């Protein structure tokens, strides 16, 4: 798994360097594209170094969290780059309430990722203690309940977005994909808790 992870990371880094090269073709129309492409390359380098420190630290939870957040930042910048080079065809309506709800949903999702990493940290501590798997989550810490309960907050926030998008006919079609993936994510968490947590252990 580690080899595959490094191989994919190397290919992704190469793709970013190629994208930086082609970004110079937009230097007259969109100069910030060069800066953003260069920023992505820097972030990819930082991510590669951070990935090494994660492995060297034997999967330190705090470094894993930073590693994941850095990955999300890279994806966010890449999506912005894709948006900036596309033709600006207005296919959606604007609604201030919806905009701030999206910001709230993003913040809640990042918080949920951090809570999930803390849960994993507590489980790793219990696993290292040598206790049988059956008792790993018999008396979980408060972070576990926070992570579980917070998923409901994230779900209802995105349900609100889904409902407002339909009611106001804003035209954001990707909200359907978000809802599907979110439900799948929650289902996977429930499955891990009630059947075999963590998988492969």
Set out the residue ranges of the language-model regions.
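Polytopic transmembrane helical bundles with strong interfacial aromatic enrichment
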Residues: 1-201
């Amino acid at each position: 798994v580690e080899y595959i992870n490094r191989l994919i990371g190397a290919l992704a880094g190469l793709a970013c360097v190629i994208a930086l090269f082609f970004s110079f073709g937009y230097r007259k129309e969109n100069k910030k594209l060069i800066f953003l492409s260069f920023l992505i390359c820097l972030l990819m380098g930082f991510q590669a170094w951070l990935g090494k420190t994660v492995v060297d630290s034997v999967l330190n939870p705090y470094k894993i969290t930073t590693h994941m957040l850095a990955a999300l930042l890279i994806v966010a910048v890449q999506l912005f780059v894709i948006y900036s080079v596309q033709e600006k065809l207005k296919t959606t309506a604007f609604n201030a309430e919806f905009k701030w709800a999206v910001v709230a949903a993003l913040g809640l999702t990042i918080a949920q990722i951090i809570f999930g990493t803390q849960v994993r940290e507590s489980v790793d501590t219990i696993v290292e203690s040598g206790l049988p798997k059956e008792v790993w989550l018999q008396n979980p810490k408060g972070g576990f309940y926070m992570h579980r309960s917070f998923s409901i907050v994230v779900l209802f926030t995105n349900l609100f977005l889904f409902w407002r998008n339909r009611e106001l006919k804003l035209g954001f079609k990707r909200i359907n994909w978000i809802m599907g993936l979110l439900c799948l994510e929650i289902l996977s968490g429930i499955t891990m808790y009630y059947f075999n947590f963590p998988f492969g252990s």
